[in-house]
């Protein structure tokens, strides 16, 4: 049976209630979230063995966080305690023409201070078959980037399949290196690349010239982009690219494509109106894709599962995708009516 390990930072998520602006009312909703943890939760939720590695301060907030992850069935036995603090991000959900806003407070977090050798990846990967990482943790600090590179090199050496969601975050790359410099090296060790057009441009230096703000996307250009990425990274086996047509903060069209050096496939498109929470939508796609590639015969089926999983996440508040395996399969199979299930 496949076991997936993810590695990265989990944060305290502080969100303004509903669609309010920051401190429009004197309260913030506190939950936890982080790209790699979100993927682990999705996989555990679908019945796969999933483990999560991070570095946290030894305090009550960390213990509450780990209790929540255990509650989803995620193995956190390889979490390491270190110096520093628990990272935070603040979220204000957008509506219509007002975009969502994220403010990071991650300086001097435990994972930002962590360095190569602080995590026993050999032990953590002992019974695993798949390792997943993102481009977020390498953006936090230079030592976190070095630790991330150590992780992918170790996973590759031990024979694990390695996936990476490039996840470019412009507000995080502050320590003197550009994303392209760091991620171009890390991606050399990746088997399955997950990205959007901005990730390919900012993290890998590969242009697409697609205007996502127009609300309409040309899939032919994405096929060219996918081929260009795999041409640059000959050891990568496939790339999945998410296609988000943003009509407004509340209304998106959502689909994706996958290329495996032989075939290029574009998924069905979902029109998502009245978005509840799009944060974690990309992580839900990544988790769905990893599940699909481990449980379906074709890449096309895996992609359809991933897109359906992510579509459902847009209807669920919080970072974690709480959609069940049966719900994802039902939507994947064409039941998107939203009718009451009795």
Specify the residue positions occupied by each region the protein language model found.
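Hydrophobic beta-strand scaffold residues
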Residues: 50, 76, 162-163, 194
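Conserved post-catalytic alpha-helical subdomain immediately downstream of the catalytic base
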Residues: 265-335
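Conserved N-terminal subdomain of the carbohydrate kinase-like
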Residues: 49-136, 328-342
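Conserved phosphate/ATP/ADP-binding segment of small-molecule kinases
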Residues: 172-262
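Short catalytic helix/loop segments, enriched in acidic residues and glycine
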Residues: 21-39
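Positively charged, low-complexity intrinsically disordered leader regions
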Residues: 1-21
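Alpha-helix C-terminal capping segments
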Residues: 31, 38-49, 292-295
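A short helix->loop->beta-strand "cap" motif at the edges of active sites that frequently abuts
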Residues: 156-161, 233-237
């Amino acid at each position: 049976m496949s076991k997936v390990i993810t590695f990265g930072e989990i944060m305290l998520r502080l969100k303004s209630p509903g669609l309010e602006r920051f401190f429009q009312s004197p309260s913030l909703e506190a939950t936890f979230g982080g790209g790699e943890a979100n993927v682990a939760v999705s996989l555990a939720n679908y019945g796969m063995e999933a483990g999560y590695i991070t570095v946290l301060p030894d305090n009550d907030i960390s213990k509450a966080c780990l209790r929540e992850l255990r509650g989803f069935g995620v193995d956190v036995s390889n979490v390491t305690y270190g110096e520093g603090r628990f990272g935070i991000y603040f979220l204000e959900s957008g509506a219509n023409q007002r975009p969502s806003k994220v403010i990071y407070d991650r300086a001097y977090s435990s994972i930002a201070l962590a360095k190569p050798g602080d995590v026993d990846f050999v032990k953590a990967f002992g019974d695993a078959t798949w390792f997943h990482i993102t481009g977020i943790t390498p953006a936090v600090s230079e030592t976190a980037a070095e630790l991330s590179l150590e992780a992918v090199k170790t996973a590759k050496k031990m024979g694990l399949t390695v996936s990476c969601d490039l996840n470019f975050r412009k507000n995080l790359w502050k320590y003197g290196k550009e994303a392209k410099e760091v991620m171009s090296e890390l991606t050399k060790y990746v088997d399955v690349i997950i990205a959007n057009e901005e990730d390919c441009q900012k993290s890998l230096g590969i242009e697409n010239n697609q205007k996502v703000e127009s609300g309409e996307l040309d899939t032919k250009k994405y096929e060219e982009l996918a081929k260009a990425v795999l041409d640059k990274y000959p050891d990568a086996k496939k790339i999945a690219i998410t296609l988000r047509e943003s009509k407004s903060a509340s209304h998106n069209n959502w689909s994706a494509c996958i290329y495996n050096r032989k075939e290029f496939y574009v998924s069905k498109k979902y029109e998502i109106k009245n978005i509840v929470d799009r944060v974690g939508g990309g992580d839900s796609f990544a988790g769905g894709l990893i599940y699909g590639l481990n449980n379906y015969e074709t890449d096309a089926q895996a992609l359809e599962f991933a897109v359906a999983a992510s579509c459902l996440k847009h209807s669920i508040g919080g970072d974690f995708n709480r959609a069940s395996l049966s719900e994802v399969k039902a939507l994947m199979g064409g039941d998107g009516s939203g009718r009451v299930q009795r």
